[in-house]
Amino acid sequence: MAHAAAATGALAPLHPLLRCTSRHLCASASPRAGLCLHHHRRRRRSSRRTKLAVRAMAPTLSSSSTAAAAPPGLKEGIAGLYDESSGVWESIWGEHMHHGFYDAGEAASMSDHRRAQIRMIEESLAFAAVPDDAEKKPKSVVDVGCGIGGSSRYLANKYGAQCYGITLSPVQAERGNALAAEQGLSDKVSFQVGDALEQPFPDGQFDLVWSMESGEHMPDKRQFVSELARVAAPGARIIIVTWCHRNLEPSEESLKPDELNLLKRICDAYYLPDWCSPSDYVKIAESLSLEDIRTADWSENVAPFWPAVIKSALTWKGLTSLLRSGWKTIRGAMVMPLMIEGYKKGLIKFTIITCRKPETTQ
């Protein structure tokens, strides 16, 4: 009994997650209720503060969501979050720290979810028309925001390519290199701490530039895409899979106050700067003279994934792992219901953007 009481007390910080998540899981049975990971509850802002937030967060191409200096402590916060949480994720979900891709309405088991994460990689490559043939397949790949390197190792095995990953998290870089060694890929794959806005690579080095769910962390979206283009070789394909907010209607100057408030609460937990829309990314790519620009909304295709993440967090293994990891990870787990809400409202869009760097002028 004493042990049970102690365990119950230790789980007290997660009681709000348990209450909120049970409600949202019931409401998210529809495959249209796509999901993601983020934020703890806060009191409502006054109407005056909400108006200020509208002005501060208006996500237009000229706003801070597409061109801004990093807020103080942002990089350190991102690094700390992933230093703390990556081990928890790997212990439950494995080496791929991104969504899975599913057919609409598909029901899936845990093994299906892991296959769906691989499918996300393959669907992204197919959408970008990355060639498989020996002459044209990628030989050199950069993985920007690499996590613990799951995508890099997969691409190295698939193409025989040299893959280089960067992350703000020293823990992730170290773990990625350790996994590469375990899998016999140390000669093909390497990871280092690096800033996506100032990549430690020369111009034109890579014929595939890959960013799987890291763009949402970038305070300056234009600089982010510009750096992806800089390190791309002439003719190289650039793939960005990221979280966006919905496109604005022609009559709108910004998102609605309640939408901005929801995103702000998510940002606070996940060390995210202001969000932007898919159309913002298209405008940035066009302004950089990138070619073959394509986008798609895959929100419905990721719908089954986050209900499974939530359920795994509510297992004994998940709950005890969260408690051992630290407050940043717990706070992130507590915002999952807000991400569910954002997807259900059509506010959050799981987006792929692909483009190509022009060939060298003859």
UniProtKB/Swiss-Prot annotation:
Its EC number is 2.1.1.95. It catalyses: gamma-tocopherol + S-adenosyl-L-methionine = (+)-alpha-tocopherol + S-adenosyl-L-homocysteine + H(+); delta-tocotrienol + S-adenosyl-L-methionine = beta-tocotrienol + S-adenosyl-L-homocysteine + H(+); gamma-tocotrienol + S-adenosyl-L-methionine = alpha-tocotrienol + S-adenosyl-L-homocysteine + H(+); delta-tocopherol + S-adenosyl-L-methionine = beta-tocopherol + S-adenosyl-L-homocysteine + H(+). Its main location: plastid. It is found in: Plastid, Chloroplast. GO terms for cellular component: chloroplast. Residues 231-240 are annotated as: SAM motif III. One of its GO terms (biological process) is methylation. Residues 204-212 are annotated as: SAM motif II. Pfam families: Methyltransf_11 (PF08241). Belongs to the class I-like SAM-binding methyltransferase superfamily. gTMT family. This is Probable tocopherol O-methyltransferase, chloroplastic. It comes from Oryza sativa subsp. japonica (Rice). The lineage of its organism: Eukaryota, Viridiplantae, Streptophyta, Embryophyta, Tracheophyta.
